[in-house]
């Protein structure tokens, strides 16, 4: 049986933090605010996987009220979700995702992001797709207040 899940996340920019997207540190003057490393792309992918599995969302599985997850790499959380998939004998068919930001442009980093995400999930990088989009200056992303990400995941049992 095939199952699909959709994920979404958003974080706002702040001074004094690193910008991490898809597990990759991207040179930029601001980072994203969050309890963990605030990796919106990985968070959206985690939520999509959990949704396809019929599980709770990322906030319930890894609550921001827990000190265990303070500043944690989202790739560590993704590996935990990969273990859940394995326990349920489910496999990822593919992931399609979109990062929405006016700046920075992510295209120079997408191959590295794909590889890191695929490694965590024990799948091929060809099963992971990452696109970058702007909002042509519209909305909070267009005003460079933050970044959002969307992900769709297809899994099979």
From Swiss-Prot:
Record protein name field: 2-C-methyl-D-erythritol 2,4-cyclodiphosphate synthase
Pathway named in the protein's UniProt entry: Isoprenoid biosynthesis; isopentenyl diphosphate biosynthesis via DXP pathway; isopentenyl diphosphate from 1-deoxy-D-xylulose 5-phosphate: step 4/6
Source species: Caldicellulosiruptor bescii (strain ATCC BAA-1888 / DSM 6725 / KCTC 15123 / Z-1320)
Keywords, alphabetical: Isoprene biosynthesis, Lyase, Metal-binding
Sequence positions that bind 4-CDP-2-C-methyl-D-erythritol 2-phosphate: 9-11, 35-36, 57-59, 140, 143
Site positions for Transition state stabilizer: 35, 134
One Pfam family linked to the record: YgbB
NCBIfam families: ispF
Annotated cofactor note: Binds 1 divalent metal cation per subunit.
Function comment: Involved in the biosynthesis of isopentenyl diphosphate (IPP) and dimethylallyl diphosphate (DMAPP), two major building blocks of isoprenoid compounds. Catalyzes the conversion of 4-diphosphocytidyl-2-C-methyl-D-erythritol 2-phosphate (CDP-ME2P) to 2-C-methyl-D-erythritol 2,4-cyclodiphosphate (ME-CPP) with a corresponding release of cytidine 5-monophosphate (CMP).
């Amino acid at each position: 049986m095939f199952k699909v899940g959709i994920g979404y996340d958003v974080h706002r920019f702040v001074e004094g933090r690193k910008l991490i997207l898809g597990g990759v540190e991207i040179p930029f003057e601001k980072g994203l605010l969050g309890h963990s490393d605030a990796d919106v792309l990985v968070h959206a992918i985690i939520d999509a996987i959990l949704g396809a599995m019929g599980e709770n969302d990322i906030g319930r599985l890894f609550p921001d009220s827990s000190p265990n997850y303070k500043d944690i790499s989202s790739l560590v959380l993704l590996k935990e979700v990969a273990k859940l998939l394995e326990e349920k004998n489910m496999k990822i068919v593919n992931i399609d995702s979109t990062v929405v930001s006016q700046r920075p442009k992510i295209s120079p980093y997408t191959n590295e992001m794909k590889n890191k995400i695929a490694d965590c999930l024990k799948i091929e990088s060809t099963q992971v797709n990452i696109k970058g989009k702007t909002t042509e200056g519209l909305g909070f992303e267009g005003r460079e207040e933050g970044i959002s990400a969307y992900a769709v995941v297809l899994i099979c049992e």
